[in-house]
From Swiss-Prot:
The keyword Ribosomal protein applies. One of its GO terms (biological process) is translation. The gene is rpsP. This is Small ribosomal subunit protein bS16. Residues 81-90 have a biased composition (Basic residues).
């Protein structure tokens, strides 16, 4: 049984509230879970009280092989429970084709202006 530490949505329409739960990876988002280990209220204005975690139980479930989802991993990294690896996107920071064409055209114009007549 693959375990996930993930978010389960609660609250009313347009007022989300999430429970951080340990659940089987195959169960629905708001379905059956094994244990509730925290909560996240994204509507609160300050970051501190937004996230509440039961760190002892989370450590236990991580030891049992539960894998946190990306959003939960961000919370765990913020409190120092589990390190979130940096993503490697080498092509994302590069400009697109049109931008590269504009840059090369600007370089050619600059070279032509700086060349002696």
């Amino acid at each position: 049984m693959a375990l996930k530490i993930r978010l389960s949505r609660g609250g009313s329409k347009k007022r989300p509230y999430y429970h951080i739960v340990v659940a089987d990876a195959r169960s629905p988002r708001d379905g059956r879970f094994l244990e509730r280990v925290g909560a996240w209220d994204p509507m609160l204005p300050k970051d501190g009280p937004r996230v509440k975690l039961n760190e002892e139980r989370i450590q236990y479930w991580l030891g049992q092989g539960a894998q946190p989802t990306d959003r939960v991993l961000r919370f765990l990294d913020a409190v120092g429970l589990k390190k979130r690896p940096n993503r490697n996107n080498p092509h994302k920071g590069q400009p697109g084709k049109k931008a590269q064409e504009r840059i090369s055209a600007a370089k050619q114009v600059a070279e032509a202006e700086s060349a002696p007549v």
